[in-house]
Amino acid sequence: MSLERELRQLSKAKTKAQRSGQLREEASVCHQLGELLASHGCYAEALREHQQELQLLETTDDPLGCAVAHRKIGERLAEMEDYSAALQHQHRYLELACALSNHVEQQRAWATIGRTHLDIYDHHQSQDALQQAQDAFEKSLAILDEKLQGSLPKRELSEMRTRIYLNLGLTCESLQQVALCSAYFKKSIFLAEQNHLYEDLFRARYNLGAIHWRRGQHSQAMRCLEGARECARVLKQAFLESECCLLLSQVLLDLGDFLAAKRALKKAYRLGSQKPLQKASVCRTLKYVLAVVQLQQRLEESEESDPEVAMGICEQLGDLFSKAGDFPKAAAAYQKQLRFAELLSRPGPELAVIHVSLAATLGDMKDHRQAVHHYEAELKLQEGNPLEEAKTWLNIALSREEAGDAYEVLALCFQKALGCAQLAGQPQLQRQILQHLHAVQLRLQPQEAPSTETRLQELKAAGDEDEGDGEDEEDEEDDDALEATELELSESENEADASPPLEEDEELRGCLGRQRVNKWSRRNDVGETLLHRACIEGQLGRVQDLVRQGHPLNPRDYCGWTPLHEACNYGHLDIVRFLLDHGAAVDDPGGQGCDGITPLHDALNCGHFEVAELLIERGASVTLRTRKGHNPLETLQQWVKLYGKDLDSETQEKAAAMGRLLQAASLGRAPHSSQAPQTLPSNHLFDPETSPPSSPCPGTPEVCEASTRVSQGLAVSTVARPRRSRHKVASSSSSEGEDSAGPSQPTQKRPRHASPSLQTKAPMPGPASDREAATTSTSWAAYREAIRGVGSAQTCRLGPSPLRGPSEIPIPQAALIPQEECLAGDWLEEDFPMSPGHRGRCPARPQSSGDGGRHRASGPGSDTARRPRAQARQSRLPYLESWSTPVRADRANSQATEPARSPDVPRVVAPTGENPTTGHLPGQVLPPPIRVRVRVQDNLFLIPVPHREAHSVAWLAEQAAQRHYQASGLLPRLSLQKEGALLAPQDPIPDVLQSNEEVLAEVTSWDLPPLRDRYRRACQTLEQGEHQQVLQAVEHQGSAPTFSACSLALRQAQLTPLLRALKLHSALRELRLAGNRLGDGCVAELLATLDTVPGLTLLDLSSNHLGPEGLRQLAAGLLGQTTLQNLEELDLSMNPLGDGCGQALASILRACPVLCTLHLQACGFGPGFFLSHQVALGSAFQDTKCLKTLSLSYNGLGPTALGPVLGSLPAHSLLRLELSSVVTGKSDVGLTDPVVHYLSQEGCVLEHLSLSANHLGDKDVRALSRCLPLCPSLVSLDLSANPEVSSAGLEELLSTLQKRPQGLSFLGLSGCAVQGPLGLDLWDKVVAQLQELQLCTRRLSAEDRNALHQLLPSQLGPKVCTLDQGPKLFFRHL
């Protein structure tokens, strides 16, 4: 029904109620009208209806109705952004609800108030509003828990709780409380799913997706938004789905996936929007994306065939990206254009234009140094063209100005630009150059500005020329570039009118461009295949059809999830059973973005206990851990802990039963289905997306439909579960910090051997002896012993046969696995070790195995085990054609059967004799050396694996740890992963890795002995002698939160082992290194240490020979990091920093958000320090909301620079300011003017001011005195070492203090020309107005001392402390 029709009907009903005098009925219609109008954005009209509703209900004396009307009026006012009036009505609503003792309305009132405060924060960024919002939501939740539990229907309670959790999650996100935010969102999503509250579920998933996007967690954001989009479809709200598509397109644009972004934007465009601005935004963005896609496709086609065309396309792409504000992509496009141009040997002017584009783009990216580099390259190419040289020199000057270079460098560039412009005869350009130069001179060199202004006046006669044609033309060209996409956009509109294509085809269309690919490789925006989608949607028939048609079983989406993961996540039991029957990887830990979550973890994390039980029956490991270190039992315990309060008794019983099952399984007592085949992953030589699917071994019986259950309590689990961020479901259980920024390559775990009780009875070819039958009944331990020496076609394992203890009886092993122990989908090769005294050979018979792509060599059984032989390993072979004939070996050699190899793969035969320590035998061919690349954090190590003895993954991890220690001084404990799959420490390296492969080492913990031992070990590693004083310091301060190594004059070589020893010293809060020789060369080591001690609150680097280059290194290392997030005090005093370090200092200030104290004494700052970097430093100081103490003493800033410095300081928070000796001589007059201006401004809270040694006189003290009443917070003033200040200045100061409500707690006048006798009256004022006075002058008389001693006992008695010795006369109130 249209809005107009609904409004007409309600208006008629309202008129009818008015005529009949039914006030309550009329109020009800007003309420409906208000809600309808508000839902369509007509807030003012809705407000009038609710106000009329309130008047009618007040007439009828309906307090509850009035309360609800106040709530609605408040909501409408909040939507109109009149928050103060909204809060008045909402608090009135709360008062009425309290008066009625209506807890339901009280709960709603607090929730509504909290929502309004959250809106206030969104508009005004008020932290107070945020805190009030949190308080209101918590009160609402408390009422729900304490008053309403059990008094309302469960669904209504869940709906209330869902919305409160969502609002609390949003509030915690704004408060940057990440853990609480995640927990609240998980609870909200869990309850919304459990109770099918799709509107609330949409809000939770959409908001969580936006949060993930803002945090840069693109993979999780995409899945949350797809989940929200699914809710919008269920609700049949096209506008909501359009919003999801629009935000999803922004995520995809961040990832650089323009094709996927185009599809999302087209959907948003077709679905439409309520908001005209949003519709225009969709249209504009879609035009841009279509243009980019078109250009990228053309570039791909012409890149190799026609470099000249490709060069032009790169330029168009760069221009397009630049206009859209995506400067990194623009710079990459221009760089590519430059490479093509150099390849084609284009003339200099053409190359120069590209350098200009690059320089301008880098300038937009604030990389001004690199921009200067490209301008200089352009200058060389434009040599001989004075006009272009002039423009380039101007650009160089402007870029250097942005980079913060000194005035001398800038002036030289401007002069060269001016000279070239004069040579080219361009008065307008000369004028432009002089205008820029004049602005720079006013800022940095005011004395030179008048002459430049005179030259400008002389050029004015040249007149103004039209300056805009070029820009207009450029805009027109850009518009033309975008207009070319109108055709495709109109096509998308026509699609909306025509019959829409199938959703599945729309989702999976064209992700790989025009390239023809395997039909099973088609994917949607998040990398999901047809099988993924069928598993998510619970379409068992569709899953069966796809698998029977040959769809791969274990493909991964871009995040790394397999179809089995999705089926377990959604709780589709029949689909899980079917996938397991056909060989799905039961213990797949997912890809890089999956946190090591196996299907069993997934099912438990979502509360699907029946699915979890089935997985355990099929041999799922109950000991595998996620990257966070949780095994399945711990995952279940976490799930119960998070949702325990919201679970009913039945679900709690099911969770307890599942816990008992997991405990029993971990002890080896779990029941297993004897009829369910355990099909393991197919050969990992094959790409799981393109290889043939696995099928059961021939003769494998079908799985029985009714399988054994642990208990009846686990038969059904309908509890809605928390979701991980994935397509069609909101993020809840995945790690907040894990992303998959792009498509991860499909990976597959090595085959995992399961218990014999889980295996299928499959007939095996070849005879089986009685001894084989006896082996069938052996225990699991015996089975593991039997397969310990097993090799595979992918391994090249060297080593002796397994050793048995003296009491163990050798169990003769058969050549074939007995039928009842068959590993469906896996196989054992003919490579058992052979006992001494037996030799022979068994003919190999190719036998098709269950995976459809591997072959098994089997033969008659033997009573003796055979030695393993090594084979070359080759990854991702398209197929294995055949097996070669067995190799006959002599007494020392075992027999070996090897696959045929391509000529470039070396054939390896490694004989194994009786004694593993014997040397190589004649005729032995050594295998090629294995080198493995191991990435540990930011370091990549190439580690050789010697063949002389078998090395395990644990050995490789130890080697990598030692190399990391040598490089960084930290010894980690590592676990190794390959393509997201954890490598077991005991596995031999050749079994799981091949040469030149890269593995990722994850740090599980750090080896951190006591600080003294770490220091000694670091000295040994660096071959540096131990410094005895440092050794004493680390012994005495090893466990203290403060570490000090001050005034030891340690050189860089001596500081390096100390800094390495302090890494990961978690107790460290204060680090004092004053009085050493850190210099610029040791800054990298300091940064590496600071990065590992995030709890540091104080850093003292004073007097350390730290120069401007070292400070720049420190700033660059802190950029974008959270290293000094908790730093409260920083001391850089007495370092030769100079005027050129302003930009670096500004970056450091931004990297320390809670900095309270900053010491910059005697750093060699002059007037140019602040004036050269006024914008950067001013902005940085203004943003230091917590700064309370600043010391700039002993820097020759002068009065000229002091004014801008004080103008940029945060007067509302700064409490202590030290400006001692900031003038260079008596000629620097006017220092007090900027100080007086600072003290007189409104909101100044300064408490202590130091102006000692600044050549001040009585006139300056008089000026300071006049502003004291305007700054009542100032209670401490240091004017010492100013010999021009006399008794007159003191008297003027004391007279002014009488006009204030309080005097001063401290006044320092040591070294001033105060001359006695001062008189009893003046001393009386001193005692009355000052809590502490410090006088140190030889001009005081005996009368002054007597007067002070006479006054103090009479007025203060014993509550005073005095010092009267020589020229010193101090007193202090106690």
UniProtKB/Swiss-Prot annotation:
Subunit structure, interactors included: Component of the MMS22L-TONSL complex, a complex at least composed of MMS22L and TONSL/NFKBIL2. Interacts with the MCM complex, the FACT complex and the RPA complex. Interacts with MCM5; the interaction is direct. Binds histones, with a strong preference for histone H3.1 (histones H3.1 and H3-4/H3.1t). Interacts (via ANK repeats) with histone H4; specifically binds histone H4 lacking methylation at 'Lys-20' (H4K20me0). May interact with DNAJC9; the interaction seems to be histone-dependent.
Short name of one Pfam family: TPR_8
Compositional bias segments (type: Pro residues): 690-699
Lineage: Eukaryota, Metazoa, Chordata, Craniata, Vertebrata
Entry-linked PROSITE patterns: ANK_REP_REGION (PS50297), ANK_REPEAT (PS50088)
Comp. bias regions, Acidic residues: 464-507
Alphabetic keyword roster: ANK repeat, Chromatin regulator, Chromosome, Cytoplasm, DNA damage, DNA repair, Leucine-rich repeat, Methylation, Nucleus, Phosphoprotein, Repeat, TPR repeat
The protein's name in its UniProt record: Tonsoku-like protein
Gene3D superfamilies listed in its UniProt record: Ankyrin repeat-containing domain, Ribonuclease Inhibitor, Tetratricopeptide repeat domain
